Amino acid sequence: MIIRAGFHIAFELPQPTPIILMLSVHPSRARDILTGSKIQAAPSLPMHSYRDGFGNQCTRVLAPAGLVEFWDSFAVRDTGLPDEVCFDARRHPVEELPDETLLYLMGSRYCDTQKLSDFAWNTFSRLGSGWETVQSICNFVHSQIKFGYCYARDDRTAFDAFNERVGVCRDFLCRCMNIPARYCTGYLGDIGVPPDPAPMDFSAWIEVFIGGKWFTFDARHNRPRIGRIVIARGRDAADVAISTSFGPSRLAQFKVHTEESIKQPDVAPCGQLRAVA
């Protein structure tokens, strides 16, 4: 399957402002890129690319005052298969977890696990396998928390969402059960499902470490989906903000597109992510 995706965003800036963008496809999908995948700007600006501590591709730019636009459009090869399901995947004792997963057991800015620990253990500790536990948590979040961009608030934590019963894409509770969980952001189009009439946005989901590997779960949609294109992974949304402006800014435009492509694109010579100039 070939998927075409991209974005076009613009900011109004009252003064020259440093910006970090996290909008490039994650390096783990580099070999799947067929065309494009290079952030462009208007006016043309020098950009510097680097990888952060989580392995995400980031772009630094000093944007001038006024209207500044950024965009990218690319084609990516995908298996066309839904998210993997493995009912037998077990939860690992903490002492058996790989060192690199332990970070994703800890509380973080939006995952205030210490406030949710008692509820999580009282509600989910009697369940059997790791898969059953995680799916039960997703079922709870899906049924008890109302999703909507109108509920977005930049200081709402997992505990706040739990109490208010509204929110956007955030993960919680898995870490309270000693299951490593990391936050992912990326593209997820309406492939294999009825089209959503709402304007398209970037999506978010979680990956949990059970059965010796990372599996994808999505409490918002709560079903295996086709065509996820990960951009970034981290502890929570604070680690994977698509843009961070070090000064006043106003979002002037925001468009995202993701769709299955029938036409085969011209393949890029190396099939890998191009460096940002």
Region spans (language model):
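Coil-to-beta-strand transition motifs
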Residues: I2, G212-W214
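Active-site neighborhood of thiol-dependent amide/isopeptide-bond enzymes
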Residues: I9, G130-T133, F140-A204, R225-G227, ...
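Catalytic Cys-His active-site segments of thiol-dependent hydrolases/isopeptidases
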Residues: W214-G234
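Alpha-helical and coiled-coil interaction segments, frequently adjacent to or embedded
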Residues: P269, R274-A277
